[in-house]
Amino acid sequence: MEPDRQAEIAALDSALTTVERVLDVEGLRSRIEKLEHEASDPKLWDDQTRAQRVTSELSHTQGELRRVEELRRRLEDLPVLYELAAEEEGAAAGEALTEADAEFKALRADIEATEVRTLLSGEYDEREALVTIRSGAGGVDAADWAEMLMRMYVRWAEQHKYPVEVFDTSYAEEAGIKSATFAVHAPFAYGTLSVEQGTHRLVRISPFDNQSRRQTSFAEVEVLPVVETTDHIDIPEGDVRVDVYRSSGPGGQSVNTTDSAVRLTHIPTGIVVTCQNEKSQLQNKVAAMRVLQAKLLERKRIEERAELDALKGDGGSSWGNQMRSYVLHPYQMVKDLRTEYEVGNPATVLDGDIDGFLEAGIRWRNRKDDD
């Protein structure tokens, strides 16, 4: 093996050792044992929400441990591949060396991707995520675009086996949605998806235009951490107005014969939250209250950041706005305007393949925070 390659493998070993230390491999094993014990309790499924979260965290933690252990195994096998290549002769030697180099490059990319997980060290990064998508300028195309974005994130969650809970969907008249709110139940979902916050821009030939003209549409993505009891977000009963109404589906049609949908208005701030996807009025009220608590927590965080920015003489941050463009015509490209990361196949991105954008966004945010 050439000295340069030996040095590069040593650098990979150092990087992986750091990952193992930061992720606390032994801690992962202990956590898996505890979760497996909880999952084996027959009474766990008496509480469906808790059972879902325990099994989701168990699956995520097991996957995280397997990923790191597999990287370590591959790294230990890598020098053997180069040794075997050195023993070959003629064309076989070239093929074996090509195979070893390909594995080196793949392993390096996988270790770099795993390193991203170690960058999620913010106060709320470990939390589950509450995502809200709102259609912006662009009429029916914007409503359709908002629904496409929702599908993209749901598909991403499904590919990672993360449960998704939809709280509210407000359908537009002709097509698409005005807004939607859903939770992604997975550890570090907030830290991962928070880089998606901002305005997403779509350029395409409008399927709703009889003259097939090019249309630019906008949708806003908001990502909040799910509130936990330790956050102490207390809301006095008198501060919330509760309105009930019938759930509606696409085109404004009623999908429920009872007033099960709930609208909460936080009187002091004017924040309005709706929920209509649960089966009963009580379930919708509980779900809406969870969303309201998350929005009030975010409002508190924004106020604290604004105070800190004022002390630092900083004008604040608006990095989330106009954060990504999805161009389907006249060429095909999805490009993040902050990180410069781009992909030339929008179809795969819109089908949930956004890990590359998430990793680039997390690295960009980490560099920005260090400045």
Curated annotation (Swiss-Prot):
GO terms for cellular component: cytoplasm. One of its GO terms (molecular function) is translation release factor activity, codon specific. The modification N5-methylglutamine is found at Q253. Keywords: Cytoplasm, Methylation, Protein biosynthesis. Methylated by PrmC. Methylation increases the termination efficiency of RF2. InterPro entries: PCRF (IPR005139), Pep_chain_release_fac_I (IPR000352), Pep_chain_release_fac_I_sf (IPR045853), PrfB (IPR004374). Belongs to the prokaryotic/mitochondrial release factor family. Peptide chain release factor 2 directs the termination of translation in response to the peptide chain termination codons UGA and UAA. NCBIfam families: prfB (TIGR00020). This is Peptide chain release factor 2. It comes from Mycobacterium ulcerans (strain Agy99). The lineage of its organism: Bacteria, Bacillati, Actinomycetota, Actinomycetes, Mycobacteriales. The gene is prfB.
